[in-house]
UniProtKB/Swiss-Prot annotation:
Modification type Phosphoserine: residues: S2
Protein name (Swiss-Prot/TrEMBL): Troponin T, slow skeletal muscle
Impact upon substituting L96P: In NEM5B; likely pathogenic; loss-of-function variant unable to rescue the myopathic phenotype in zebrafish morphants; severely decreased interaction with TPM3 in absence of calcium; loss of interaction with TPM3 in the presence of calcium
Family listed: Belongs to the troponin T family.
Length: 278
């Protein structure tokens, strides 16, 4: 050993001996401080010195044990948190799976309901189309029957009345002036006296119905023709008045049917048939 090491070793030995003596020596009672005279309080507060806690004698503190217990406690808390986290995560996953299953079930139910509604709507549209077609067929059949009845009634009125209606329908679309109407009416009423082709015997036979007291003359024959034509016109007028009355009655019946149908028709506004029939 060198001189320096020996000197250090000799210095350490008295220090160790002094430390052992201090540990073995009983603690001396602290001297009681005598009460001092009151001093004036300082303007600034005095912070007392920090005194470390005294460790009781005879008890040794094992810091390793404290650290180990603290580590065990932290580990237990961490393990508890991990278990709670995984339980919460498992619960959330179960809820998510249940939510997905509920969504899929709801989606399938909604698709089934939509399919059912589509089928119902298709059936309803088919029924409406069938009902509409049936009504149209009934209306067409009814119109055909009415037309047949009208044609039968018109055919029973006479050939002259039918001819007059045909002429009226043909000339209804063309509007005539007053002069043209007068010329047309006079031409229809005034028939030309054609006797050029008749012989003497035919003229005698034509005038045979006259009374013997009255001589045969062209003016009398013309008056008789005009009288017959007036009778024919009166007959046609009577037939036309009867037909007009029948048409007014049919129009009133149709108007009442339309009004009755519009009252009970669903989803339609108020209808109105124009015109006024007396």
């Amino acid at each position: 050993m060198s001189d320096t090491e020996e000197q250090e070793y000799e210095e350490e030995q008295p220090e160790e001996e002094a430390a052992e003596e201090e540990e073995e020596a009983p603690e001396e009672p602290e001297p009681v401080a005598e009460p001092e005279e009151e001093r004036p309080k300082p303007s600034r507060p005095v912070v007392p010195p920090l005194i470390p806690p005294k460790i009781p004698e005879g008890e040794r503190v094992d810091f390793d044990d404290i650290h180990r217990k603290r580590m065990e406690k932290d580990l237990l808390e961490l393990q508890t948190l991990i278990d709670v986290h995984f339980e919460q995560r498992k619960k959330e996953e179960e809820e998510l799976v249940a939510l997905k299953e509920r969504i899929e079930r709801r989606r399938s139910e909604r698709a089934e309901q939509q399919r059912f509604r589509t089928e119902k709507e298709r059936e309803r549209q088919a029924k409406l189309a069938e009902e509409k077609m049936r009504k149209e067929e009934e209306e067409a059949k009814k119109r055909a029957e009415d037309d047949a009845k009208k044609k039968k009634v018109l055919s029973n009125m006479g050939a002259h009345f039918g001819g007059y209606l045909v002429k009226a329908e043909q000339k209804r679309g063309k509007r005539q002036t007053g002069r043209e109407m007068k010329v047309r009416i006079l031409s229809e009423r005034k028939k030309p006296l054609d006797i050029d082709y008749m012989g003497e015997e035919q003229l005698r036979a034509r005038s045979a119905w006259l009374p013997p007291s009255q001589p045969s003359c062209p003016a009398r024959e013309k008056a008789q023709e005009l009288s017959d034509w007036i009778h024919q016109l009166e007959s046609e007028k009577f037939d036309l008045m009867a037909k007009l009355k029948q048409q007014k009655y049919e129009i009133n019946v149709l108007y009442n049917r339309i009004s009755h149908a519009q009252k009970f028709r669903k989803g339609a506004g108020k209808g109105r048939v124009g015109g006024r029939w007396k």
